[in-house]
Amino acid sequence: DTMLASQVCWAGYDSLQRADKATKNFWKTKTPEQSLKALAERHLGISLSKEFQASNWGADTLSPEQKVYAAKDVKVLLPLHEILMELLQKNNLEHIAELEFTALPSVIEMELTGLPLDTQACRSLMEQKKTQAQVLLQKLQAEAQKAGFEARRKKGTKYSPLLNPASSQDVLVFLQAQGYDISSTGEAALKELAFNGCSWAGDLLQYRKTSKQANDFLEKWLLKLSPIDNRLHGQYFQLSTRAGRFSSREPNIQQVPKRGEEGLAIRRLFRAPPGKKLVKADLSGIELRIMARLSQDKTMIEAFQAGQDLHKLTASKISGLPIEQITKAQRQGAKAVNFLLIYGGQPELLQKRAKETYGVDMSLEEAKEAHRKFFQTYPEVAAFHEKQRTLKRLPKNHYLHNYEKGFYSRQAVTTQTISGRKRIWGQREYGYTLASINQLYNSPSQGTGADLLKAIMGEVYSSLPDEVKMIGSVHDELILEAPEALAQDMASLLLGIMRRVGS
């Protein structure tokens, strides 16, 4: 697959280009295109017309123009194959490309088979979410009106004095009038306000989330159901994220909430038809095991080898209590500590995320103490972070190709997964790079997780009997659909492959 091979070679590379007409941001990032048309132009200097791409290819007889179009597409494949194979070899990425190629059949099967959706339950949950959103909307508008807010009149629109929560201007004007010093109505700014006691901002965030679940998830799913088999047939993209992870669209299954009762209620809408069962397995918690491997932290490795609960161990080290005395609440707080600090989170962010994501109240002093004791307990994680930071000063040669220069190398900041997948950032003038510190921390871990999932998918697919289908990948979870009589065997097969590949 030329697109996958090229995406592996370019490995997330962006270029900075001057935006001459910009009034604020004078530089913009540009990501190289990886379509067959773009590859032919970049590597061969050949311009492929796509005029007949959407023409009727199911006709009994193809037109002469269609035949020429198809022939030109085929003509560029062999020379592109030779160039891309050499590019993979020069960058030592052949095995990563092979990993992607092996996973591809399972991705095709997921798209073709689709996800079975309980339409009645989906419609019921959608109506419930819309009702919740309407209640929140009325509350937001009533509080704004009580505080004296009155919307500005706009030409060409029907006037309402009520605040429109979808209008950034309305929200900004109202909050500033209440004395809040903000310049953005984005999620981060609103979370900051809610964290500091602004209940209206918290209600607005909940309204946005509930509306999105009702309209962008549930309602769109019902509209996207195939009239042929009543299933959701999304598009999966193996390498659309720079770390090598999956994404999807039409619908975006990857946006299904991962945590909490709300996420569970939505995921339960995927139900097997009569006579079938869904078999699921995930790589939950794999980030900590990956970090143990990347950092070679002795305490982490020994804990995993001994079968210890790392969240309880962290809670024990922070609190000074024996592991057996750790409470459920303390373990929950340690989850926030573990999952945030392995990616370089600071105490201020830890305090906020503990509350937002895990429902744990933590003072700033407690967050600072947890931060100190975490890195005291896992010193090699701190050493790994320091090593990653130095990468910004140590760009390496990465090979690229175009038809004008042929093969050439460019200095680039590079991170690698355990498997050897690269993510690169171009090195700019004065040492500036597009890589942020947190990206240098989390790209190797997230990319390794993606490598594991794809290796598992490829092996599982080749091991499945014909009557069992791989139907989905949501976050780090794989979903199979099997006849009831085979479900237990498939669960054992899936678990065995995941353990073997993960080891």
Q: Where do the PLM segments sit?
A:
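Active-site-proximal helix-loop-helix substrate-binding element of RNase H-like nuclease domains
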Residues: 1-89, 97-100, 308, 312-319
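Active-site palm subdomain of RNA-directed nucleic acid polymerases
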Residues: 88-98, 452-478
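Metal-dependent catalytic core segments for phosphate chemistry
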Residues: 280, 287-320, 417-433
